[in-house]
């Protein structure tokens, strides 16, 4: 017998499977819609989408014991590197119809894959843009509560800082998935993460850092706050 209970983070759920194993899930904002072939559970008249940590760095962070999760129902999120919307679809479930996601993606081909998803998920606003040039989408994005960044570039810390200066409310939060090999392949991941933390701390208060192994190799997730 499958059972669903609330996670400590609002909008996130825990599915207890027949074998007793636990998986995280979100309540489907668009019942009947699958985004990336994920498993769907029906429980007490609601539909829940299993959040696969192997396909989502944010999902991996929650499974790995993330302590600070500023994405909540009703919040506005600037998502840098939204890609085809795997993680963003779960964020969409969490923020709900009262919230919104501005999804920045550099690749027109990848953004096209998002179109059928956002036709029904009206709380996702896809924007073709370059996250290294936040001024490019100034006319389309308002101040937000949270910025989530998943952009594999050497300057990824600077990208978060520049976007936070333009779009993050005071007291708002940033979350960034850092891939050490994208920054410097010659250095040990731990050294890269320390350098990123130092760079982030020049502008933000760094609240948490979490390793994403075994789901993502040489990745860490940072949670920061804008003073």
UniProtKB/Swiss-Prot annotation:
One of its GO terms (molecular function) is histone H2AQ104 methyltransferase activity. GO terms for biological process: box C/D sno(s)RNA 3'-end processing; tRNA processing. SMART domains: Fibrillarin. Keywords: Methyltransferase, RNA-binding, rRNA processing, Transferase, tRNA processing. The keyword rRNA processing applies. It holds the Pfam family Fibrillarin. S-adenosyl-L-methionine binds at residues 86-87, 105-106, 130-131, 150-153. Its EC number is 2.1.1.-. CDD domains: AdoMet_MTases. Belongs to the methyltransferase superfamily. Fibrillarin family. Interacts with nop5. Component of box C/D small ribonucleoprotein (sRNP) particles that contain rpl7ae, FlpA and nop5, plus a guide RNA. These sRNP particles form homodimers, giving rise to an asymmetric holoenzyme. Involved in pre-rRNA and tRNA processing. Utilizes the methyl donor S-adenosyl-L-methionine to catalyze the site-specific 2'-hydroxyl methylation of ribose moieties in rRNA and tRNA. Site specificity is provided by a guide RNA that base pairs with the substrate. Methylation occurs at a characteristic distance from the sequence involved in base pairing with the guide RNA. This is Fibrillarin-like rRNA/tRNA 2'-O-methyltransferase. It comes from Pyrococcus furiosus (strain ATCC 43587 / DSM 3638 / JCM 8422 / Vc1).
């Amino acid at each position: 017998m499958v059972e669903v209970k609330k996670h400590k983070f609002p909008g996130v759920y825990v599915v207890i499977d027949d074998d007793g194993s636990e998986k995280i899930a979100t309540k489907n904002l668009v019942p009947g819609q699958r985004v990336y072939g994920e498993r769907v559970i029906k429980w007490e008249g609601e539909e829940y989408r299993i959040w696969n940590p192997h396909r989502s760095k944010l999902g991996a962070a929650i499974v790995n014991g993330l302590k600070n999760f500023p994405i909540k129902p009703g919040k506005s999120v600037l998502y840098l590197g939204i890609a085809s919307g795997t993680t963003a679809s779960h964020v969409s479930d969490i923020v709900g119809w009262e919230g919104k996601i501005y999804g920045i993606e550099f690749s027109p081909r990848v953004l096209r894959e998002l179109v059928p998803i956002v036709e029904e998920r009206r709380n996702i606003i896809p924007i073709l843009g370059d996250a290294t040039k936040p001024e490019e989408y100034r006319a389309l994005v308002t101040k937000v509560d949270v910025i989530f960044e998943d952009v594999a570039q050497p300057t990824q810390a600077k990208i978060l800082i520049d976007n936070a200066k333009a779009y993050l409310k005071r007291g708002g939060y940033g979350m960034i998935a850092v891939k050490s090999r994208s920054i410097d392949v010659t250095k040990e991941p731990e050294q890269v993460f320390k350098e990123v933390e130092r760079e982030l701390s020049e502008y933000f208060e760094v609240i948490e850092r979490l390793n994403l192994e075994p789901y993502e190799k040489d990745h860490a997730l940072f949670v920061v706050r804008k003073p």
